[in-house]
Amino acid sequence: MTPGEVRRLYFIIRTFLSYGLDELIPRMRLTLPLRLWRYSLFWMPNRHKDKLLGERLRLALQELGPVWIKFGQMLSTRRDLFPPQIADQLALLQDKVAPFDGRLAKAQIEEAMGGLPVDAWFDDFDIQPLASASIAQVHTARLKSNGKEVVIKVIRPDILPVIQADLKLIYRLARWVPRLLPDGRRLRPTEVVREYEKTLIDELNLLRESANAIQLRRNFENSPMLYIPEVYSDYCSQNMMVMERIYGIPVSDVAALEKNGTNMKLLAERGVKVFFTQVFRDSFFHADMHPGNIFVSHEHPENPQYIGIDCGIVGSLNKEDKRYLAENFIAFFNRDYRKVAELHVDSGWVPPDTNVEDFEFAIRTVCEPIFEKPLAEISFGHVLLNLFNTARRFNMEVQPQLVLLQKTLLYVEGVGRQLYPQLDLWKTAKPFLESWIKDQVGIPALTRALKEKAPFWVEKMPEIPELVYDSLRQGKYLQHSVDKIARELQVNHVRQSQSRYLLGIGATLLLSGSFLLVNRPEWGLMPSWLMVGGVVVWLVGWRKTR
């Protein structure tokens, strides 16, 4: 480790101990050297004994800085790893840090634009940031070409070395988790860190975020439900993104929405429909839909429209995952736990040798109490969480796309019920899911598949006669080869039969000669000749087996 890494590790350990986070490690798992090491740090006591463990963990991560804050935010979505009281506290982590100097942002923009001054491309550039987070910050301006208001998002300078250094230390700590926690190996800490690293590195590439925003905008073009601001691709680079500036009401500001006369019931239901449309129609969903990234248009409040920003994190499901997920939801709400268990096995989410009866019983035990609530109060996100937690006991592998989906679903539910507490998610989602499943099977689905494949088959049609001829010719050669192999096998079979016959005769002559030599010495040389003949016949038979 470099001196810088040692200093950083010391700061991390001091922070963890000052918040009493060594309580996360069961005493029985502390080896003697670790106990002595902890006692030697008596001058680093827990200074926050009045706070609960979850709150102390949240405060410690905030003190460690942006990389750890974002790590905590990601961990808050993995409720299979932590008890609710800790996961709830991690969900409160706010990715808000002090802005960096606007002059640095300006210099970075000029570098991205080929060294030209900012006013060559933008008017009214505001040196003061509109918003600031751990990875990037945003400035406002107007496009010189058309006068449109835009926001310019720039990556923090020199953030990559900081992220790489902290990730290296997080990996080191993750390797200790299986040794220190009884359930550490099942938690797969290294996989969790690897997943976080991928998400974080993706967020550093604003070209990726630009492409995501363009795709989402195209998917919801002219939609009354969701608006994605326009991205000005000509101005975008890996470290800079320029997009349309929007004005809306934060979705968390319920009072302002009500004051604007917003139809709250319709707004809440549209949030659910937007989510399921992204997942099942488009297979491409905004996976960071927390309240800070969602606004509501001021216009036509009786027909409200969401505005989505910050498309750095997206998720996608393949066709099989979508079908299994939809059927899982429907089977669960029909209380068909056998079907739920079979779907998990069929999808490959759990090993194929899983005992379906045991799995069904485990799902029933965990999920049946949920139905003690009214249907309108049942949380889709917690249904998924319960199913995944149960499946993990049966060695379900981590499915990153499903983890993202479950996190997003919890956000959508939370926002929806904040807007309209009586929101019945199942009533809103069931027709959508049933319609989607119906659309995937039967004559319409077959017709659609044939239409999709028709251009391919039309293109390949001229090649079919040649392919048939080649197949017939290959078949002829194959038949010739098969006949040849059959003849060789037959010859080998005859040879093996002869060999066994000769070996038997040789052994018989050898044994007979030996017997006569011992018991009938008066027979003279006859026994010896029998033995010699037996050896010769046996050797001939043995040679035929080679």
UniProtKB/Swiss-Prot annotation:
E.C. no: 2.7.-.-
Cited SUPFAM superfamilies: Protein kinase-like (PK-like)
GO biological process: regulation of ubiquinone biosynthetic process; ubiquinone biosynthetic process
Gene Ontology CC terms: plasma membrane
InterPro entries xref list: ABC1_dom (IPR004147), Kinase-like_dom_sf (IPR011009), UbiB (IPR010232), UbiB_bact (IPR045308), UbiB_kinase (IPR050154)
Cell compartments where the protein resides: Cell inner membrane
Active site feature: D288 (proton acceptor)
TM region positions: 501-521, 522-542
GO molecular function terms noted in the UniProt entry: ATP binding; protein kinase activity
Binding-site residues, ATP: L130, A131, S132, A133, S134, I135, A136, Q137, V138, K153
Broad enzyme group: transferase
Membrane disposition: Multi-pass membrane protein
Associated pathway: Cofactor biosynthesis; ubiquinone biosynthesis [regulation]
Record keywords, A-Z: ATP-binding, Cell inner membrane, Cell membrane, Kinase, Membrane, Nucleotide-binding, Transferase, Transmembrane, Transmembrane helix, Ubiquinone biosynthesis
Disulphide bonds in the chain: none
Domain Protein kinase: 124-502
Membership in a protein family: Belongs to the ABC1 family. UbiB subfamily.
Function: Is probably a protein kinase regulator of UbiI activity which is involved in aerobic coenzyme Q (ubiquinone) biosynthesis.
HAMAP family (alphabetical): UbiB
NCBIfam families in UniProt: PRK04750.1 (NF003404), UbiB (TIGR01982)
Name the UniProt record assigns to this protein: Probable protein kinase UbiB
Organism (species): Salmonella gallinarum (strain 287/91 / NCTC 13346)
Source organism phylogeny: Bacteria, Pseudomonadati, Pseudomonadota, Gammaproteobacteria, Enterobacterales
